[in-house]
Amino acid sequence: MAAAPTRRLTDDVPADVERRLRRLCLALPDAYEEHAWVGTRWRVRKRTFVHVLGVDDPVDGAHVVMTFRAAGAELEALRHAGPPFHVLGWGRDAMGLTLDAATDWDEVAELVVESYCVLAPRKLVALVDRPDPT
């Protein structure tokens, strides 16, 4: 019996998606960009807060995924939100977001900032302009 086809991870990320994420991520204190084992990642103090990569899935087709970190009530809400969000199955606070034509880039900006704040040292988080939750 032949094995079921598996998804393949790729560097195939549209330039405009990578450009938008780069602008958001590099605006954060001490953030830097590097090529990951696949795709591109943005880090703070050697901790990845955003990673973007292509996924070629035999069932769902090719798409782009942004991985990020979340915490607390936001993490629980995202775990139950359904598409375009998905639990990655690794890391207690890791989530994925499929990026496509319907992506809300204001929401992506908020997710990027929150992901950064989950992983960055407190002194750097204090420098970030975060929206007032009230």
Question: Model regions: which residues?
Answer:
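Charge-dense, helix-prone N-terminal extensions
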Residues: 1-134
